[in-house]
Regions:
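N-terminal glycine-rich phosphate-binding loop and ensuing alpha1 helix
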Residues: 1-41
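Short aromatic/basic micro-patch
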Residues: 7, 15, 95, 162, ...
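Short, high-confidence coil segments that cap the C-terminus of an alpha-helix
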Residues: 34, 82-83, 110-114
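Short phosphate-binding loop-to-helix
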Residues: 38, 44-89, 93-106
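Conserved core of the sugar-phosphate nucleotidyltransferase
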Residues: 96-179
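A C-terminal functional module that forms or caps the active site or interfaces directly
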Residues: 172-192
């Protein structure tokens, strides 16, 4: 969870009902079958809020280009093993449920280095550039974009990923692709 969002700075601390967004995300993760839950952040404000609701937090550098790069720093601090499965839930996804997280855990397939979830694309999200779209062929992601033309294989991407620590060690050494930079979507680095 980072403080300096280009679209809405401080987004993880925005209140949804009685709680900050980051607390909703953390609580969904804690309810899942994941063994451990940590918030990785570059912000002392976010850290303080997480500690206030008794969450576990790992401080990271402000220099990371993406959340996945931030996760890499965090897992090096907790001594992740290559075979450990990491579930990366974006800090601004308060409506991802523990059932979504469990679905990703239960269905992770080692034949693929990275996995994610998607759902039907609602009509109101078609032209919304904040709603990331995923193009799927045979249950395999072929591309991601904020601005796809509608077709039968376009869905709404959920901000959650699964990968082994071994893959993450490789991912952070890949150069950012042109598509990743243009779209501001880190998952394109894995596809490209």
């Amino acid at each position: 969870a980072r403080w300096s969002s280009s679209r809405l700075p401080g987004k993880p601390l925005k209140k949804i009902g009685s709680k900050p967004m980051i607390q909703w995300v953390y609580e969904s993760c804690k309810k899942s079958n994941a063994d451990f839950t940590f918030i990785a952040t570059d912000s002392e404000k976010i850290r303080d809020q997480v500690l206030e609701f008794n969450g576990q937090v790992i401080m990271t550098s402000i220099d990371h280009k993406t959340g996945t790069d931030r996760i890499y720093e965090a897992i090096t601090k907790i001594k992740c093993h290559e075979e450990d499965l990491i579930i990366n839930v974006q800090g601004d996804e308060p409506f991802i449920s523990h059932d979504d997280i469990n679905t990703l855990i239960d269905n992770y397939n080692d034949d693929f280095e990275m996995a994610t979830l998607y759902k039907e694309l609602k009509k109101e999200d078609i032209d919304d550039t904040n709603a990331v779209k995923i193009n799927v062929t045979g249950n395999i992601a072929t591309s991601f974009s904020r601005d796809f033309k509608l077709s039968d294989s376009i869905y709404h991407h959920l901000g959650i990923y699964a990968y082994r620590c071994e893959f993450l060690n490789k991912f952070v050494n890949y150069e950012q692709s042109e598509n990743e930079i243009r779209e501001s979507l880190e998952q394109l680095r894995a596809l490209d």
